[in-house]
From Swiss-Prot:
Pfam families: Poly_export, SLBB. Gene3D superfamilies: Outer membrane lipoprotein wza domain like (3.10.560.10), wza like domain (3.30.1950.10). It comes from the Bacteria. This is Polysialic acid transport protein KpsD. To E.coli K5 KpsD. The lineage of its organism: Bacteria, Pseudomonadati, Pseudomonadota, Gammaproteobacteria, Enterobacterales. Involved in the translocation of the polysialic acid capsule across the outer membrane to the cell surface. May function as the periplasmic binding element of the PSA transport system, in which it transiently interacts with the membrane component of the transporter, binds polysaccharide and transports the polymer to a component in the outer membrane. The keyword Transport applies. It is found in: Periplasm. One of its GO terms (cellular component) is periplasmic space. GO terms for molecular function: polysaccharide transmembrane transporter activity.
Length: 558
């Protein structure tokens, strides 16, 4: 009896363990697994686990486009086999084609007739009419003449090709998906190549494509004739025809100042440079070519003017670089703002600011002691440095370590906040302002595309950023930075120890503590303050806020 009770007790324990093991609603914090109820009920599982982290799989990497000229024919295209070929007057009718025939007048008939194996269609009261081998353009005249043999008058005829014969064509060789593909006799070679996935851009040839019927070669196709000249012969396919894409032939690469920067294929052992340039289409202003050629373990470069291209040849594996080798003779700058002179000036290369200031005609509102200079190259460099700072900030926020689960959750929320801030900051475009020194402003060298702005005289001081009411305040002698901030309602509660900078009218940025007196046209910027346990994050955000305020005159908040 005791033995029986022991067996029952052991069985009950195993049953309890099994029940606990299959409890799909068990606490995931204890089991380490997410609850499965939603999944078993056909619901989608949440992409975020209980800790709040996003488990969404990363997006697939972008598809790398091939550099081979011709690969664009098969990028994202799908074959559309149109059965009607009435638009092609040279189409030759074959058994299996469908022809629409309409007769009206003394005798009426309207129907679709199929060409039988003997090449005939049968017209009521007329009899068989042989149409196989007749071009589509002659079809209506042929049927009309046969009807007129029976009905001399009062019967009108209209005949047109309705549908071509369905066929199956083999596509093989160096294509992505070789096989047997269906279509109609009027489908072009491109249709069948697209159905087979296109020419393999790494191994296949765009200039060596053969169409065979049995053992007889019907045509040799070079797709470059279509891409460059719009020529693609129309051929009618029959059941069992084979399209063979050969292996890649010789190639050369074109880079530089050209419209078609691709790798090109050619059939012969060499190709004239002039023909290669006609394919690549150099941009206006291109002056020179560089031919880079590998010879064994050595690499040789040749540099010529484009005018000397005739007579020179490219070989397999060569690289042709087209460049513009010109020296700037003049530069163009724009003069904007408060002046009465010309707004565009063409100056000799190497001109200085003095050459512009001598031609500027200031008016009564011109603030000539605060001339501003904006340069595209400086704006590009500012953008590069801003992106670098943003990248470091993201790395610092994502690499922060946590010792507890609560701290990890806070770090995750902070990282999401910083990611949104970084996304906003990436959209900011720096102005590229160059701070001019009054002592040597005349000797500043100018670049092509520079913009010189003559600011207007003003009696206002602008206050931006973390103040209750950002506004413009009338300038008053003796007022300090704190006075202007108080005029705008004072600092916000979260900016008690905020960093304040003053931007002069000429673009110079000065710490507010170092400003003795404010001038008309100054801008006071109160930067937001951000605190984090991660010192690198705090330093990174503070640096970026300062860069945005000085480089783009923009204040972003988190």
């Amino acid at each position: 009896m005791k033995l029986f009770k022991s067996i029952l007790l052991i069985a009950a324990c195993h049953a309890a363990q099994a029940s606990a093991a299959i409890d799909i609603n068990a606490d995931p914090n204890l089991t380490g697994a997410a609850p499965l109820t939603g999944i078993l009920n056909g619901q989608q599982s949440d992409t975020q686990n209980m800790s709040g982290f996003d488990n969404t799989p990363p997006p697939s990497p972008p598809v790398v486009m091939s550099r081979m000229f011709g690969a664009q024919l098969f990028n994202g295209t799908s074959a559309d086999s149109g059965a009607t070929v009435g638009f092609n007057p040279d189409y030759i009718l074959n058994p299996g084609d469908s022809i629409q025939v309409r007769l009206w007048g003394a005798f009426t008939f309207d129907g679709a007739l199929q060409v039988d194996p003997k090449g005939n269609i049968f017209l009521p009261n007329v009899g068989p009419v042989k149409v196989a081998g007749v071009s589509n353009s002659q079809l209506n005249a042929l049927v009309t003449s046969k009807v007129k043999e029976v009905y001399q008058s009062n019967v009108n005829v209209y005949a047109s090709l309705l549908q071509a014969q369905p066929v199956k064509v083999y596509v093989t060789g160096f294509v992505r998906n070789p096989g047997l593909y269906g279509g109609v006799t009027s489908d072009s070679l491109l249709n069948y190549l697209i159905k087979a996935g296109g020419v393999d851009p790494e191994r296949g040839s765009y200039v060596d494509i053969v169409v065979k019927r049995g053992n007889r070669v019907r045509s040799n196709v070079n797709l470059y004739d279509f891409l460059l000249n719009g020529k693609l012969g129309l051929s009618q396919f029959a059941d069992g025809d084979t399209i063979i894409v050969g292996p890649r032939q010789h190639t050369f690469s074109v880079q530089g100042d050209v419209f078609n920067s691709y790798d090109f294929e050619f059939r012969e052992s060499s190709i004239p440079v002039t023909e290669a340039l006609s394919w690549a289409r150099p941009k206006p202003g291109a002056t020179h070519i560089t031919i880079m050629r590998k010879q064994g373990l050595q690499k040789r470069s040749e540099y010529y003017p484009i005018s000397s291209a005739p007579g020179r040849m490219l070989q397999n594996g060569d690289t042709l670089i087209v460049s513009t080798d010109r020296y700037a003779g003049t530069i163009q700058v724009r003069v904007e703002g408060a002046h009465s002179g010309e707004h565009a000036m063409v100056l000799p290369y190497g001109s200085t600011m003095r050459a512009v200031l001598e031609k500027v005609r200031p008016n009564s509102m011109s603030q000539m002691n605060a001339v501003q200079l904006y340069r595209p190259s400086v704006a590009q460099r500012q953008k590069e440095m801003l992106n670098l700072s943003l990248q470091k900030l993201e790395e610092a926020s994502l690499s922060a370590q946590s010792s507890t689960k609560e701290e990890a959750s806070l770090r995750m929320q902070e990282a999401q906040l910083i990611s949104r801030f970084v996304a906003k900051a990436r959209t900011v475009v720096p102005k590229g302002e160059v701070i001019l020194n009054e002592s040597n402003i005349d000797s500043v060298l100018l670049e092509d595309g520079d913009v010189i702005n003559i600011p207007e005289k003003t009696s206002l001081v602008m206050v931006h950023g973390e103040v209750l009411f950002p506004n413009a305040v009338s300038w008053q002698k003796g007022m300090t930075t704190e006075d202007y901030i108080e005029k705008c309602g004072g600092l916000t509660q979260k900016s008690g120890n905020a960093r304040i900078i003053v931007i002069r009218q000429n673009g110079a940025a000065v710490n507010a503590e170092d400003v003795d007196s404010l001038k008309p046209g100054d801008e006071i910027m109160v930067l937001p303050k951000y605190e984090s346990k991660n010192i690198e994050v705090t330093r990174g955000i503070s640096t970026i806020l300062y860069q945005l305020a000085v480089g783009a005159k923009v204040i972003l908040s988190l």
